[in-house]
Structures are given as C-alpha cells and as structure tokens.
Regions:
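Membrane-interface motif at the C-terminal end of an N-terminal transmembrane signal
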Residues: 15-32
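N-terminal Sec-pathway targeting helices
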Residues: 1-16
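Metallo-beta-lactamase
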Residues: 164-171, 175-217
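Alpha-helix C-terminal capping segments
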Residues: 46, 105-112, 178-182, 217
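Active-site neighborhood of phospho(di)ester-bond hydrolases with catalytic His/Asp-centered motifs
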Residues: 66-68, 90-102, 116-118, 169-172, ...
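Active-site HxH/HxHxD metal-binding segment of metal-dependent hydrolases
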Residues: 72-75, 82-153
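Conserved beta-strand hairpin/beta-sheet module of binuclear metal-dependent hydrolase folds
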Residues: 32-84, 179-191
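Cytochrome P450 C-terminal beta-domain/meander region
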Residues: 151-164
Length: 217
C-alpha cells in the first residue's frame, strides 16, 4: 500500500510539474511589464501584479482607464491617481479589453466612471456563460459584478473629455475581446503580448476561447 501511495504521489507531482512547465512556456519570451512607462504622451502604464492597466489623460483633471487590474483594492491604480493629485472620481471612463477577472477587479472603486465594452462579452461578466479556454474553463461561470454602462459597436469612436478612443471587436481570446486605439497607441489586452524582441505574439492558447481566431486579427 505504501508503494502505491508513493507511486501515486510521484504521478501527481509529475502531472503538476508538466502542467506548470507548459504554462510557463506559453509566457516565455514575453517582455516585462514596466511600471510607469509612457508609450505615448498622455498614456501611462500601471503594473498590477502580473497584469497592467493604462491611464489616459482626458484633460482638465480627468482620466480614462484601459482595464482595471487584478487587485480589488486597486492599490496600484489609486497610487497612480494620488501621484497626479487626483481621486477616484477623476476616472470618467473604463474601457475593458475583456471580462476575465484579472482585468476588471477594481472597477467598483470608480462609481463615476462609464464602463465600455462589447455586448458579446457581457455573458462572461455576468456569469451566464463561462470561459471556454482549455485551462480557464475549469474555473466555471462566475458573476463578476461588473456591468457595461455603454455597449460599443465595432469601429465606434468615443469621446471622453479631450480624449478620443476608437474601439474594435477582436474575438478569440474571449468572445467579446476589444482593442482600443487612443493617442496613437493600440491597446490589445490579452489578445496579444509584446516580446523581448520588440514584436508581438498571439493570445496564450491555454487561457483563450479560440487562439486561432485571435491570430486572424
């Protein structure tokens, strides 16, 4: 019996180790997230654990966010607002790239913000549908508590103060994944990743509904 238990334990460790190596390989070569980097004037990256958000200047003490991070307490984004001598009410709009929990956790901290996204993503966010990726499907359906206040059309342009944001529907990572073009920067969320070589690669297959579809955009 003892030998059987040892054998089962070794098998479990092998499976877990192989799974970990597989996931690690999916992220190999990704460029690091540089907190505080500014890819364009009026655009600042904020690192929140293993993900990032972007703060976009909208003029007159107003900002918009691309995504809202993985921390429900929003420590990183609140610190960035404080650095600008702004409070939560300065956030007038949040543009969500998709509905996975690591990109929308702090939305509730900004009650004055309009929340933008595509209708195809709403079922994932309200729990009527679950993620479909090979790994994330095991997380099951979950109501994030986040709702869009404005549903976008593909190619729509939105104005927030002095900022204009053009929205594109790019299904693949999730059914309603979005890309946003603002201040000359294209924000792709998890639909693509920057590499150490200065190129981009497609969505990570393990967490994507349809990584082949994501590569078509």
């Amino acid at each position: 019996m003892k030998k059987v238990l040892i054998g089962l334990g070794a098998l479990v460790l092998l499976i877990v180790g192989s799974f970990g190596a597989l996931i690690a390989s999916a992220f190999a070569g990704n460029a690091p997230i540089v907190d505080g980097s500014e890819p364009a004037p009026g655009v600042r990256q904020v690192k929140d654990g293993f993900v990032s958000m972007f703060v976009l200047d909208a003029g007159e003490g107003q900002v918009a966010l691309i995504d809202a991070g993985t921390d429900p307490e929003g420590k990183a984004i609140l610190a960035e607002l404080a650095r600008r001598k702004l409070g939560p009410d300065a956030v007038k709009a949040i543009f969500l790239t998709h509905g996975h929990g690591d990109h929308l956790a702090a939305v509730h901290l900004f009650p004055k913000a309009d929340v933008y996204g595509f209708g195809a993503e709403a079922p994932l966010m309200d729990g009527t549908a679950g993620p479909r990726g090979p790994i994330v499907r095991f997380f099951g359906k979950k109501d994030s508590g986040v709702r869009f206040t404005h549903l976008l059309a593909d190619g729509e342009t939105t104005t927030v103060g002095s900022l204009t944001v053009k929205s594109f529907l790019i299904p693949g990572h999730t059914q309603g994944s979005a890309a946003y073009l603002a201040r000359g920067v294209l924000f792709l969320g998890d639909s693509a990743a920057a590499t150490n070589e200065g190129t981009i690669k497609g969505a990570v297959w393990a967490f994507s509904d349809d990584s082949a579809q994501a590569r078509l955009h």
